[in-house]
Amino acid sequence: MSRFCALNIGNTHTQIAMGILKNSAVKWEKSETFATSAIPFTELPIDIFTVYSSVVPQITAIMKAKFPQAVPCTAANVKSVDFSSAPPTLGMDRIANCAALVQKNPGGIVIDAGTCITLEVVANRKFIGGAILPGTGILARAMHDYTGALPLVDCGITPDLQQFKTETLTAEAMKIGIQSAAVAGTLQLLSNFIKKLPPASPVFVCGGNRQSLLNQNCTVPLLDGGNDFTMQGLAALAAMYMK
């Protein structure tokens, strides 16, 4: 058995977990979520093999300075997916999602519904691209910040879009507009991208707002990737280095 630490550092939240690898299988021993602005760096183990994904440049710099032995989830470090066509700026979270996907199937799509909504498309273990959309929180903030009177609304989880009706209250009208833009935009891209893959290619949905997509009556079956999909990609990275 081999123990390791994994950090999934997002824009708003960071998941830190201790894992145990045994016969290529991972068991999560402990998992905690923190605000990214309050990561307990002084409490991170320095004597345990560590892997991480970070989408925050300032935090990435801290990790490199304080934990130079930790392995970042970069395209160069992940060998299970061909990233030869990807730009050097490809986010670590997207790379980790691809690594998690190919543990389940050589190809498919991962939709990560977080602060931003990302789609990753993998065909025969090769990353072929994807898309990035603003999440509901970003859209809500933009409408509030760039107008003089619109309030800042909390959109929460999006129900089935087919249930929406006309709204008279400004906040409710904004809410259904924002939810529709984020969800319908994502599903439209999915319908385009899935055509690039063989029939029955899996589509996994992960991220804190994934239920908003899982609630939809989608023509493409959506699989719940759970709370630790990105962490599974980090576990795959750890397994490769700890062989």
Annotate each language-model stretch with its function.
Residues 1-27, 107-126, 143:
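Gly/Thr-rich phosphate-binding beta-strand-loop-beta motif of the actin/hexokinase/Hsp70
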Residues 23-62, 176:
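N-terminal phosphate-binding loop and adjacent alpha-helix
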Residues 30-32, 161-202, 209, 222-223:
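Adenine-nucleotide phosphate-binding core of ATP-dependent small-molecule kinases
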Residues 46-56, 71-72, 199-208:
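Short glycine-rich phosphate-binding loop at a beta-alpha junction
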Residues 67-101:
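Glycine/small-residue-rich loop that forms an oxyanion/phosphate-binding "nest" at active or ligand-binding sites
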Residues 68-80, 217-233:
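Conserved phosphate-binding/catalytic loops in two-lobed NTP-binding clefts
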Residues 92-97, 102-105, 128-176, 237:
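Glycine-rich phosphate-binding loop plus the immediately following alpha-helix
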Residues 95, 179, 223-243:
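Glycine-rich phosphate-binding/hydrolytic loop that grips phosphoryl groups
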